């Protein structure tokens, strides 16, 4: 039995959001929408994708999550899609911010009538749909269709025979963080790194040298940002910081490490600059670990300026 459902997302035209800002509106002519943006979605449907996920953006003023033309008329009637449609994370709730509905209850009604089958984490359906059906705002036929499409997929996955097939604590303990998986992840990460330059074979730093290395920056001891955004199950306690990795790698050698944070990730506070500069002057080599907070690289975290908030001027002609 196949036990994975493919999901096509985000439906639709999420890449056309104005100014590149997530959740924003997309103003598209019918020709552009149908001939440029829709073909990949149709190809996914024809390939047998089992689910579609609604996008956050508006299309010509209507959020995808509440767009009946998109989810029912086009996807189901014209294209013949038989699977189920799920919102993006709290996608129904988000429609209130688009000012197309006044409250969460109305958002749930709009989504249900548009053809949204599953509410991802928003809690709108579970809280309001019974009341909406009693008030005649959503038909029982709509509910039946949505439920049937979800249950059919669960049946095809074998969950009717064994609904707890993957809820195995012992299996998880023996699978997650296995040494061979960690090694594969390490090798994959190493292959993804781009070394922009290595003048005079600066790297790797020899273990035989009697030198002091200054590790400076907010990413030196940081562990949560090692996982990055959308890390799923990743736990900061399981990450190895730059400081931990280097001090372990060079333990028992003549290479000495000193450290200064220098700044933080979320403000332009310069109060730690002096300490960082003083630390750099005590070292033969300076390694600066800079970057942006992981929350800034996720969805709805658009920035108008890609510069780092705090830059420490620690380089000198005598410091590589």
Cite the ranges covered by each PLM segment:
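Glycoside hydrolase catalytic-domain context in secreted enzymes
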Residues: 1-315, 319
